[in-house]
Amino acid sequence: MMLQTAFTDLANPSYLNMGLALLLATIMVMILWAGMRLKSPAVFVIWALTSITLIFTFVTQFSFIWFWVMVMLSLLLISIVASIRYTL
């Protein structure tokens, strides 16, 4: 329930608590770790785009949508790169 409240309030630029900041940092570290592990430039590009999206998250009124779209695209790209890399 608290996590849901934190993500609901993500659209408010003045709101950022420690738990939400930790969650965002964890997501960024996981994407960066996947990029280093898979040695794929595409994952590093997604990491940079996710950083930009986090800025949009606190600037635009559609921040909640932007954030989740970018997280889902990042995870999708990581899974595709991982499956291609380990299949070949």
Swiss-Prot record:
Keywords carried by this UniProt record: Host membrane, Membrane, Transmembrane, Transmembrane helix
Annotated localization: Host membrane
Bilayer topology term: Multi-pass membrane protein
Annotated disulfide bonds: none
Transmembrane portions of the chain: 16-36, 42-62, 64-84
Gene Ontology annotations for the cellular component aspect, listed alphabetically: host cell membrane; membrane
Identification of the protein by name: Putative transmembrane protein ORF24
Classification of source organism: Viruses, Viruses incertae sedis, Halspiviridae, Salterprovirus, Salterprovirus His1
